[in-house]
């Protein structure tokens, strides 16, 4: 028993290994991006690295890397190890070039994504259990109360006000591909509803900036719909910081 525990401990120790890694993210059915990065550390069951594209806890990424064979849980004879990974931790930080970057911690979940991900890439997941077959993490779809701030967001003060903002959409390279000056329908510390003519699918990430103060936050699109008035709206959840409400009411 002691020997098995020691082996399990060794397997889960992080190994500092700066291997190149190709990161694929399907933000929505119609949009994906690829970014090259380097590992900070790795175990057979997860890894850490840094990317410049926004993402969020609960999303799935596909990693491709020349993983040492002794650290693999499958595909031991393939040159490249292609593994799906769940974002467990995300820390935004300012890079030396002034650009925002994200330190990501992921858990490896297997060779293939869940069927629900194929249908809806914006689906968010949580860890459910460990596979007895390969010791990788098994997933289930996250419930509303488990997705970051969803539960507390519903209790947040939501101000019904037309706050002047700009909405920016990113392309596959992370550059701004479209933008629009508009106003909010309502706003809270954790999210907002904005009127916009931009065509942005659920699951995409956008930047929302106050045209009055210059305050800028990254947000995930939770829904895109038209209200009873026929005007299209985006329902946004802020993912990197909160929006201060002081002085707005």
Language-model segment annotations:
Residues 1-249:
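Structured alpha-helical
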């Amino acid at each position: 028993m002691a020997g098995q525990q020691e082996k399990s401990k060794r397997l889960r120790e992080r190994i500092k290994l700066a291997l190149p890694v190709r990161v694929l993210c399907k933000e929505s059915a119609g949009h994906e991006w690829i970014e090259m990065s380097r590992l900070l550390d790795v175990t057979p069951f997860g890894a850490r690295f840094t990317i410049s594209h926004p993402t969020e806890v609960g999303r799935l990424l596909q990693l491709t890397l020349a993983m040492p064979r002794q650290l693999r849980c499958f595909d031991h004879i393939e040159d490249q190890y292609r593994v799906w990974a769940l974002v467990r931790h995300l820390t935004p930080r300012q890079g030396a070039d002034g650009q925002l970057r994200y330190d990501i911690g992921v858990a490896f979940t297997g060779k293939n994504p869940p069927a629900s991900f194929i249908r809806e890439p914006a689906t968010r997941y949580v860890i459910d259990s460990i596979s007895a077959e390969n010791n990788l993490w098994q997933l289930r779809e996250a419930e509303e109360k488990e997705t970051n701030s969803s539960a507390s967001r519903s209790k947040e003060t939501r101000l019904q006000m037309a706050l002047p903002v700009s909405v920016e959409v990113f392309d596959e390279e992370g550059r701004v591909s479209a933008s629009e000056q508009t106003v909010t329908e309502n706003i809270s510390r954790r999210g907002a509803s904005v009127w916009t003519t931009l065509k942005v699918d659920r699951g995409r990430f956008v930047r929302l900036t106050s045209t009055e103060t210059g305050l800028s936050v990254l947000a995930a699109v939770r829904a895109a719909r038209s209200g009873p008035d026929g005007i299209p709206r985006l329902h946004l959840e802020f993912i990197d910081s909160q929006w201060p409400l002081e002085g707005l009411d």
